[in-house]
Every structure is written in C-alpha cells, then in structure tokens.
Design a protein with these regions (language model features):
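Phosphate/NTP-binding elements of NTP-utilizing enzymes
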Residues: 1-185
C-alpha cells in the first residue's frame, strides 16, 4: 500500500513524508473564483489576529472556560507578538508564563514554520513548565487542539509541533544550550 492511500490526520503531513501526495483535488473554476474573491478578507483576518492576539483569544473563547484578560495582560500579549524582545518586571502570580506560552501558541498558528524555545534554569524545569501550560491552555481553549500536530513530553524534553510546521521546544539557560538556534527564545 502506498503512502498516498493513508489519509489519517497524523499521517498525512507532507512536510514529514516526502512520498505523500495530497488527496485534495484542485479546485474548480467556481470554487477558485470564490476563494480568490475572499483572499483579501483572509489576509486581513490573519493580519488582525497577529496584531491583536488578545482579541483573537476573545474570539475563540468557548462559552464556558477561557480567561478574562486584564488590560496590562492584553498589552503584554500585544507587545510579545509585535516585537522580538521586551523587558518587564511583573509580580508573582501575574501569569507571565501562561501568557508567554499562549502567545507562542498564537504565533505558531499564524506564522508557519516559526520555532520557539521556552527556557528555564534546567531543561527539566522548562519541560515541566511547558507541559503544565500546554495542558492548561488546551483545557481553557480547546480550539488549539485542531492546530497541534503532535505534543511530546518527557522528563527532560518537550516539543509541540503544529500542523503548519511551527514548533515550540525547551532549552536550558546554561552553556549546554549554546549554538542551538530558534527564531525566538
């Protein structure tokens, strides 16, 4: 049986299996014209979601669940999405790690192929943080379940891969992580 016959959600990723050819047939003229006529709307929506990640969370918030963000948390998310680096001093219990990880999730959805790393003193700490926040986010925002291709967690390593080839993994704040490259840490 060829790879083309497999049409299972986790096995049909063209990026991970070069022998796979999409089972999707090309669009007819009518469907293509409809897609083309709405392309500007899709582009505007993605641009809006990239610029206002807090409002995107409000949009995908389920009827029961989700969180209500404060204005300073909204500002934190917007700055994290718009700039490569930022500096802030926040108190304990302000949900810094949660907001950082959920902003990574949103960026992974809207920037295909981006690579993030969550860092902590050790890889074990970073792995535990990412696992806890991953579970918390999926509980509060089940929409992200459809965007995640695979999530692997072990004692000293963690990786979340998205369907658009973006990923989040962990690094330690130590000399053992020197030379490892990511788009954003």
């Amino acid at each position: 049986q060829s790879d083309n016959a497999k049409y299972v959600r986790k096995e049909n990723r063209g990026n991970y299996n070069p022998a796979f050819n999409s089972a999707v047939e090309s669009l007819g003229k009518e469907e293509f014209d409809q897609f083309k006529s709405n392309l500007d709307k899709y582009i505007d929506f993605v641009s809006w979601a990239r610029f206002y990640p807090d409002l995107f969370l409000d949009l995908i918030k389920p009827k029961t669940g989700g969180i209500n963000l404060h204005s300073d948390q909204r500002t934190f998310m917007r700055v994290a999405m718009r700039f490569l680096s930022m500096y802030g001093v926040y108190p304990r219990g302000w949900s810094k790690t949660f907001l950082e990880v959920i902003t990574m999730f949103i960026a992974c959805v809207f920037f295909p192929g981006i690579e993030f790393a969550l860092t902590a003193q050790t890889k074990e700490n970073a792995s535990e943080l990412l696992k806890d926040k991953h579970n918390d986010i999926l509980k509060k925002y089940p929409w992200f379940k459809n965007e995640i291709y695979e999530a692997k967690f072990s004692r000293n390593d963690a990786e979340i891969r998205f369907v658009n080839d973006s990923r989040i993994d962990v690094l330690a704040n130590s000399s053992s992580s020197k030379g490892q490259r990511r788009n954003i840490i």
